[in-house]
Every structure is written in structure tokens, then in C-alpha cells.
């Protein structure tokens, strides 16, 4: 028992300042050493000390465009919506997704369930950024992350906003520092960027960058999950909103760490069009279709970093539900498996207990009639090394499982669970149907320790 206590103590990342410990060696591979960032965007990460114990780490992030942007966002469905969620939602609605210049984010305090005063604090954060830009209309989205039920040290934040504005930069180091500033229990900053082209301008290069944070309280439905994406492609607000909604549904809304949905979850995207070209406005255009694929793939890669940093996680698990009669039914089944504590703890214990997976499939609520037919259902483990799949259940019949091989597969950090519904009532095994993919992690002793100590 003493040895176990020492092991857990060595792993724990207590909630304090953003990324206040050395980044674990196993996570360093996820931190980019360079990037391709969109034209016209500048960023900064500044120390405020929102949380009293934070004496040196950046905890105020500012992302700004040198020109007005189209903007879109998706927000938490939690009924206790934090003040910055309410304020940002109102700004996008009032401005109709036009003329947005910046996003300001603090870590260390969620500004959630803080009443009228909390709303005033969120408004004042955005207004202070607008003043630095010489703007009279609300043009800054606001996000916060941290402990719920506490007021922001707003005077400290407002004092540092001009400093953050003065430090705005387009360098890779600035982007990485900004990604660091939004972290709480995260063990590493989550930042990605890429270039792309569009069919209408094959010779023109565009860039897309994004940062996110989250390690616990992750089961979004749009620890706290926040994300900001920026592109220099020209996209009209209505098209941008539909593009974001589609991509988030297949990325940030398809991950789970612990099944909890935060009061603050927000994913926003800004498009300033600085790279030129014809604006994307119609969902029927080739550019729209290409951008949808690009944004969805990018958002999936970014959201998967959250799962890889799940509190106490030792495994990154992909669950792939095939041959569902419709996408949403497949996603509901994948989500139920991903949320199951029994599945997650079995994976942590390296136990090929496929009965727990089958149980989760069977009690999934809200799926289309005929989606789950026991005699059509198959479950398997797919190794990431490309070796043959390990069948656990085929057409409702259990396989003679090679426990030794199952143990080898479960020793790996990455694992894929494949659930084949056989198309339900629509057809034979393996024919037709939709595919839904979800990403999640296991439950370990460390998760309990981290969250038991969260406010201390």
C-alpha cells in the first residue's frame, strides 16, 4: 500500500498554475517545434496570477486578428452556463458573426455561477481588449476556465490586458505560450497548425491553427474544454457556423474523458480572409466541401490531444461503430461505450472483458429501432501495429479468445475497439450502414486522486 501511495503521489498533477510541472516525457512528442500560422493573427500569453498560487506562469491568453473576422462558436449545453459563455454567445448573435477581432481567455477561475457580477466581469474583459484596439463595438469573445463558483480577480486581469496586447506576436513561441496560458490540469499545451489549398485557388496557400485545453470534465456536447481555431481563408459567417458545427460534432463532441460536461465548454473559430481568394458562402460549393473535410480532420486531431492528456489516463482508445442504420445512432452507441466506468476500468486493468462493452451497447438510449440486433453484432480489438484483429464476439456468438494475445494488445497505449452492428434490420453482417467514431481514455487510480485534491 505504501508503494502504491508513492506511485500515485508521483503521478498527480494537482490543479494549480497552468502547466506548472515539467512536461512528462511521454507527452513531449505532442508539442510542435514549429508551425504554419495564419496571416494577420497575433497572440500572447501573459502572467496575471488569477489563482493566488500562480506566481509566474502565463494565465491570460489573447488571440487577435489585425483585421475584422467572421466568427462562429459552439457552446456547452450545461444549463449552468458560465458568464463568458453567455457574453460570447450574445456578441456573436448581436454582431451576426461579423466584425470580431479577438478572443481573450483566462485560466485559474471559471467565472461560472457568479451571478450578475460575473457577467459584468466577463463584459469588462472583452471591453478592455476592444479599448486597446480602439474599438467601440463589442468585438472580443471571452472564455474562462478553472474552479466554478468563484469571482474573477477582475482588477488584476484588466490591469494586464494592455500588457497582453502590447506583447502580441505571430511567432511560434508566442503561439505556444498562448496555448500554455489556457491550461489548468493539462500536462502539456495543445497546439496544431497546417496549410491547405481550396479548389477555386489551387495555387494559393491557406493556414489553419488551433489551440485547445482540457484534461478532465470532458464529455462535451456542443475540464473544461476550450478551443480557438484561426484561419486566413475567407469564409462568410453563416458558412463558418455550419462548418464548425459539422466538424465539432465529429471531433470535440466525439471525445470523452470522464463523462462530465462543463459549464464553460466553448469552441470558436475566426476567419479573417487575409490570404485572399473568393469567400466561401454556399454549402453547395466545392470550396465548402473541401473546407468541411479539412476542418473536420483538423478538429479531430486537435480534440484527440485532449483525450491523450486525460486526467490519470494510461490509454488512448478509439471506438469505431460500423454498419449503423444512421450516424447518430452509431455515435450514441460509441458515446455510451466511451462513458462506461466498467469499460474504462477494465481497459486500465488490461482486462479483455468484452461483456462490459456489449452491456454498454445494449443499454444505449435513443438509437433508431432495430439498430442493435444481438445476432448481428460483432466486437473486436484492432491492434495499432497492423496485426490481425482479435475477434471477441462474431454475429452474437462469443469467440474462444486468446487471452495471451489480448493481454499483449492491452499493454499498448493505443487501442481500437470495433463494433459491427451488421446494419441492424437493414441487411446482412458487414453490408451498408453508417460509421461513427469516438475517442476516450481509461479510468485510473490517479484520476480519483487528482479530482479529490482539485481545490487544494
Swiss-Prot record:
Its EC number is 2.3.1.35, 2.3.1.1. The record marks 145-146 as: Involved in the stabilization of negative charge on the oxyanion by the formation of the oxyanion hole. Keywords: Acyltransferase, Amino-acid biosynthesis, Arginine biosynthesis, Autocatalytic cleavage, Mitochondrion, Multifunctional enzyme, Transferase. It holds the Pfam family ArgJ. It is an enzyme of class 2 (transferase). Its main location: mitochondrion. Heterodimer of an alpha and a beta chain. Belongs to the ArgJ family. This is Arginine biosynthesis bifunctional protein ArgJ, mitochondrial. It comes from Aspergillus oryzae (strain ATCC 42149 / RIB 40).
Amino acid at each position: 500500500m505504501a508503494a502504491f501511495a508513492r506511485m500515485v503521489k508521483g503521478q498527480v498533477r494537482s490543479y494549480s498554475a497552468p502547466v506548472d510541472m515539467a512536461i512528462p516525457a511521454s507527452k513531449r512528442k505532442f508539442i510542435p517545434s514549429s508551425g504554419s500560422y495564419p496571416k494577420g493573427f497575433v497572440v500572447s500569453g501573459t502572467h496575471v496570477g488569477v489563482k493566488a498560487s500562480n506566481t509566474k506562469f502565463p494565465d491570460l491568453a489573447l488571440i487577435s486578428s489585425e483585421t475584422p473576422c467572421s466568427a462562429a462558436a459552439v457552446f456547452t449545453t450545461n444549463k449552468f452556463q458560465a458568464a463568458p459563455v453567455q457574453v460570447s454567445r450574445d456578441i456573436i448573435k448581436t454582431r451576426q458573426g461579423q466584425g470580431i477581432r479577438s478572443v481573450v481567455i483566462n485560466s485559474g477561475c471559471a467565472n461560472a455561477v457568479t451571478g450578475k457580477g460575473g457577467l459584468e466581469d466577463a463584459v469588462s474583459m472583452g471591453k478592455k481588449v476592444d479599448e486597446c484596439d480602439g474599438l467601440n463595438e463589442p468585438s472580443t469573445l471571452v472564455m474562462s476556465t478553472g474552479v466554478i463558483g468563484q469571482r474573477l480577480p477582475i482588477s488584476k486581469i484588466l490591469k494586464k490586458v494592455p500588457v497582453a496586447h502590447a506583447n502580441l506576436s505571430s511567432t511560434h513561441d508566442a503561439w505556444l505560450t498562448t496555448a500554455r496560458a489556457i491550461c489548468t490540469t493539462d500536462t502539456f499545451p495543445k497546439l496544431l497548425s497546417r496549410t491547405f489549398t481550396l479548389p477555386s485557388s489551387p495555387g494559393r496557400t491557406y493556414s489553419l491553427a488551433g489551440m485547445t485545453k482540457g484534461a478532465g470534465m470532458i464529455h462535451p456536447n456542443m475540464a473544461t474544454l476550450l478551443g480557438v481555431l484561426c484561419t486566413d481563408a475567407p469564409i462568410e459567417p453563416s458558412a463558418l457556423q455550419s462548418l464548425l458545427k459539422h466538424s465539432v460534432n465529429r471531433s470535440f463532441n466525439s471525445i470523452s474523458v470522464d463523462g462530465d460536461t462543463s459549464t464553460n465548454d466553448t469552441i470558436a473559430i475566426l476567419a479573417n480572409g487575409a490570404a485572399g481568394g473568393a469567400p466561401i458562402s454556399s454549402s453547395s460549393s466545392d470550396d465548402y466541401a473541401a473546407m468541411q473535410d479539412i476542418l473536420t480532420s483538423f478538429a479531430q486531431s486537435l480534440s484527440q490531444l485532449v483525450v491523450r492528456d486525460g486526467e490519470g489516463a494510461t490509454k488512448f482508445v478509439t471506438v469505431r461503430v460500423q454498419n449503423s442504420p444512421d450516424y447518430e445512432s452509431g455515435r450514441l452507441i460509441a458515446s455510451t461505450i466511451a462513458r462506461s466506468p466498467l469499460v474504462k476500468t477494465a481497459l486500465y486493468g488490461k482486462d479483455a472483458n468484452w461483456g462490459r462493452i456489449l452491456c454498454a451497447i445494449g443499454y444505449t438510449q435513443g438509437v433508431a429501432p432495430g439498430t442493435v440486433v444481438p445476432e448481428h453484432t460483432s466486437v473486436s480489438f484492432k491492434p495499432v501495429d497492423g496485426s490481425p484483429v482479435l475477434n471477441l464476439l462474431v454475429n452474437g456468438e462469443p469467440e474462444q479468445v486468446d487471452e495471451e494475445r489480448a493481454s499483449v494488445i492491452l499493454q499498448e497505449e493505443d487501442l481500437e475497439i470495433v463494433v459491427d452492428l451488421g446494419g441492424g434490420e437493414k441487411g446482412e453482417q458487414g453490408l451498408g450502414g453508417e460509421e461513427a467514431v469516438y475517442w476516450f481514455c481509461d479510468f485510473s487510480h490517479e484520476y480519483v486522486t487528482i479530482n479529490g485534491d482539485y481545490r487544494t
